[in-house]
Amino acid sequence: GIGAKLLAALPAHEEGAKAILIEAECPEKADDEAMAVRRLGFYARCGAVDTGWTEHLFDAWFRVLVLPAKGETLDAETANKELADCYSRVMGADKWRRYVRLYRPDGTEEKF
């Protein structure tokens, strides 16, 4: 459908990007678990890889996914460091540390 076409075209619009980072709602924390599972399936069919990391952003929980761009990709650790850096720059360090938490697959919090 159109969503898959849009997602497939996105890397071409981000020149120089190794990957596109996607935050998808965690099914086990979602109001609509079935919809969240379908979204994860959609992203997987489009080539996105679940890093195994989760993110707590304000009051919502997300899985961190990586969509490779131009045959390149980011490993899970680097992807999450980049995500943390993005939020820190956009929100400012104080708000970022207050409202954003990243967790490794084993559940331990990572403070980049």
Could you describe each region identified by the protein language model?
Residues K18-F112:
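Terminal substrate-recognition subdomain of acyl/acetyltransferases
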